[in-house]
Amino acid sequence: MITRRSFVVTGLAGAAATLARPSLLLASRARYDVVLRGGHVVDGSGRAGIDADVAIANGRVAMIGRSLRDSGRVEIDVRGQVVAPGFVDIHSHGDGTLWQDPRAESVIRQGITTIVVGQDGFSRAPATSDENGTRSFRSFGDLWDALGNLRPAVNVASMVGLGTVRSFAVGDANRPATAAEMRRMTQVVDDALANGACGVSSGLEYTPGAFAPREELVALCRPLARHRLPYATHLRNEDDWLVDAVGEAIAVARDAGCPLQISHLKTQGPRNWGKLDEVFARVAAARRSGQDVTFDRYPYLAYQTGLTNLFPVWSRDGGVRELLSRVGQADAGERIRRETLAKVELIGGWDNVMISGVSSAEDKPAEGKRLGGYAAALGRDPYDVAVDLLRRSGGNVGMVGFAMSERNLERILAHPYGMVCTDGGAFAIEGPARRGHPHPRGLGSFPRVLARYVRERRALSLEQAIRKMSSLPAARVGLRGRGWLARGFAADVVVFDAATIEDRATFADPFQYP
């Protein structure tokens, strides 16, 4: 993991405006660097909070106690505020924009001090080349060196993505790996873990990761057992075959002997909302048998992915160019259309598909538009518009799909083995990190949990929520000395007003900070 700031105090939703002006004291008279006075300390353990002072020295929590006598060079009055560990985003795509804007404004402003990237089977290392300036690296050592030079505003941990590993060794073809390729991939995973990767991720709805059979996944996850690090998976299916996909993930982790983290757990499409009980039952059964199974989720009812993900996996064999070629073929094209329309119907139609980003300047007006209405305004069929968007952007088209249940979301967030994530990037309301029309989760997830699901709906307590945002994810990926407010731990600290904290980013206007 690369670290940037050992001490961050973030005021959320106006909390900074209520903080007293720091009183500066002479260094010779101060024992601590910073003392936060009189806040309500929720330490990340899940236990009830206490009113206390928090003293910080040399980048670490030095003391927590009521009315500490010794002073700090900087003293901050935080009475009426919650003082908590800096949040850990266990499923982040912040590695996509950090290189252009290392300030990570949308991350820091949510109180997130550590992001775990390399998700859904894609990581910045290992790669054979830095294609299209995407900042990919030959090894994890090279990645850490580059991040060290970049000095981003947040701590960064990364998993190694099995889709990236497969592309590195096998390419993008839909075929089994050879014995030699398996040896190479296993070595790559071993090397990544030895050089600081905090787990292994897969994206089994994306190519080339979707082409990996269970046996390949098991073999590549076995090195995790030695490190006691998790296999984090974007399941092979999150709708009609969700229960089977959960079963596959549990089986992979069982056979590999490693912990399992189910990424952004969801039941997609109204006809699948009733499957959550069976999913929870599968998780409970696995845990009773001795497996370590947990999951994460962001607090919204829509997901974000690539528009190509609406198209069947078999049609994406070989990449976007092959997909677009097959679309134009008589038999294959008709089958692709039929299966794509079935997928769209599952989530409620084209008006539940919003375009979140395109690379073609010609199609920028489509960003933020529902595809059904956008196509109607053009007098065209939505499927044909989708294909044209992909063609003109070389497949680089993002989408938001509206397909989830509020009740299920609350149950997932409140579940004892659930954690909070953004599944979003690092954005800014100005500069190079303002891109497209993204899902609001990248700017509002953690404040939204605290505002909507703790304060308003009371789906979980403040202490439970903070634990799911700090100590649980930190422990999950082996971050020692982070995720708790405790003596000797890194002074990653967030301060906020629990009565007023609020997310402001919306699907209509995502570029708004909390």
Region spans (language model):
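Active-site neighborhoods of metal-dependent hydrolases
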Residues: L147, A153-N155, M159-A179, M185-Y206, ...
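C-terminal cap of metal-dependent C-N hydrolases
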Residues: G39, R326, R411-Y417, T422-D423, ...
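Alpha-helical scaffold segments that flank or form the walls of functional sites
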Residues: G96-R124, S129-M159, A177-N195, V218-R226
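N-terminal secretory signal peptides and thylakoid transit peptides that target proteins
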Residues: M1-G14
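Divalent metal-coordination and catalytic microenvironments
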Residues: G39, G59, G80, G111, ...
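Histidine-rich, glycine-flanked metal-binding segment
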Residues: L24, S28-V34, V41-G86, D503-T506
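Divalent metal-binding pocket/active-site signature
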Residues: D191-A249
